[in-house]
Amino acid sequence: MPQISKEALIEQIKDGIIVSCQALPHEPLYTEAGGVIPLLVKAAEQGGAVGIRANSVRDIKEIKEVTKLPIIGIIKRDYPPQEPFITATMKEVDELAELDIEVIALDCTKRERYDGLEIQEFIRQVKEKYPNQLLMADTSIFEEGLAAVEAGIDFVGTTLSGYTSYSPKVDGPDFELIKKLCDAGVDVIAEGKIHTPEQAKQILEYGVRGIVVGGAITRPKEITERFVASLK
């Protein structure tokens, strides 16, 4: 795995934009053959991105062929009836750990998990198995972020705010959560519903370690829908 320290990664992504480049099977940019996501990555890098967030072993392997930017990797896999689906079990962690990526992100919400573990126990198991791997917690509320840090997580993402039944539903970033975590001394990677450059700039002022933007850059269907809706 990349022997990059947390400090070195923080320096690399400081004051920049990490671009999430993903397409799920039901989305227009998804193809069985692959090849589309690396093009998005190349465009993001040429535009000045400092990192990439990506989903699936296939996409990450293809991405690594076109860029040296640091990668936050996830595997989205459903485990019904449980809700967590972002790197939800050790199986996904194992698959990602083989890819030599800088950061592995995992669902760190308090929701019931497929493996039956409390999230802090799962984090401890991952840290024990992969002690040199940097980890990012995808969370939805303040308490989840603190619990993840306590268990040894490196970065806390606000990725899932608005996507759990108990977190605020707003059409935009959860500024309050991001600021509260930063004020508590947490190493935050802000993510989720960051639609505009102005929002990203405001978030940067809170003292986050990194900012992930996805849909507003790499989901043309979603971007088109926003323009269309604004005219109605």
From Swiss-Prot:
Keywords per UniProt: Carbohydrate metabolism, Isomerase
Catalytic activities: an N-acyl-D-glucosamine 6-phosphate = an N-acyl-D-mannosamine 6-phosphate
EC numbers for this chain: 5.1.3.9
Gene3D superfamilies per the UniProt record, alphabetical: Aldolase class I (3.20.20.70)
GO cellular component: cytosol
Superkingdom, taxonomy of origin: Bacteria
UniProt key word Isomerase: yes
Pfam families from the UniProt entry: NanE
Transmembrane segments: none
CDD domains noted in UniProt: NanE
Any one biological process term the GO annotation gives: N-acetylneuraminate catabolic process
One MF annotation (Gene Ontology) recorded for this entry: N-acylglucosamine-6-phosphate 2-epimerase activity
Keyword Glycosyltransferase part of the UniProt annotation: no
Pathway: Amino-sugar metabolism; N-acetylneuraminate degradation; D-fructose 6-phosphate from N-acetylneuraminate: step 3/5
NCBIfam families found in the cross-reference section: PRK01130.1
Purpose of the protein: Converts N-acetylmannosamine-6-phosphate (ManNAc-6-P) to N-acetylglucosamine-6-phosphate (GlcNAc-6-P).
Family, per entry: Belongs to the NanE family.
Name of this protein: Putative N-acetylmannosamine-6-phosphate 2-epimerase 2
Protein source organism: Streptococcus pneumoniae serotype 4 (strain ATCC BAA-334 / TIGR4)
